[in-house]
Amino acid sequence: MSDTSAPQKYRRILLKVSGEVLMGDTPYGIDTNTVQSVAEDVAEIVKSGVELCLVIGGGNIFRGMAGAAKGMERSSADYMGMLATVMNALAMQDALERIGVETRVQSAIPMATVCEPYIRRRAQRHLEKGRVVIFAAGTGNPFFTTDTAAALRAAEMQCDALFKGTSVDGVYTADPKKDPTAQRYDRLSYMDVLAKDLRVMDASAVALMRDSNIPIVVFSIKGRGNLLTVLRGEGTHTVVAEDRAA
């Protein structure tokens, strides 16, 4: 059992998880064991007293840009991708509530019989009451990624940081899965990321985080307990902030 009593650097964070992470070792869809592992990590954070909201991608089910590349009309493909994020959000809500974490899903596309609509002040009240809020359906608009949605919600919720949980333990000079000589950055500025096109998040998301002065912390969510470790400023990760000394 992880020690959740250590002091935390942040009061409120947004956790962005790619849909691909939820596949686990399966080629498609939702791996329930992986969802449960992420839910247990989130539960540890909530137990430590940090307020947490969550954005999950939909790439494990459908990716709008991939559909558009195969000839689909981009808006239709993006809406399908947004609906995929709702499926992932409901799976995560179920996993969290089964271990006793109060959770609300808010969708940018209204679907009243399934979840709450996105209402900023209501979401803030949920967080203040110790509930996890999962933001689904991206921004509700095509042509915007879930990275941009995560950045937008982090700014609206006045989060202290955006944690991006991926399958890689930080930001590298090249794809470490393809280039064994790739080196990991400990810290980067927002301008470094944009100028070097490092693909931490899409450019609009990075620019919004820069304008809101919200650090981006990139880490691997695949290791159990990594989220709490990185939250304490420990473990392997990359911080993107106003300057390298931030």
From Swiss-Prot:
A Pfam family reported for this protein in Swiss-Prot or TrEMBL: AA_kinase
Enzyme class: transferase
Residues binding ATP: K16, V17, S18, G19, G59, R63, T166, Y172, D175
Activity control: Inhibited by UTP.
EC number(s) recorded for this UniProt protein: 2.7.4.22
Reaction equations catalysed: UMP + ATP = UDP + ADP
Lineage top rank: taxon: Bacteria
One MF annotation (Gene Ontology) recorded for this entry: UMP kinase activity
Cell compartment(s), UniProt: Cytoplasm
The protein's role, per its UniProt record: Catalyzes the reversible phosphorylation of UMP to UDP.
Family per similarity comment: Belongs to the UMP kinase family.
Protein name: Uridylate kinase
Organism in which the protein naturally occurs: Caulobacter vibrioides (strain ATCC 19089 / CIP 103742 / CB 15) (Caulobacter crescentus)
Gene: pyrH
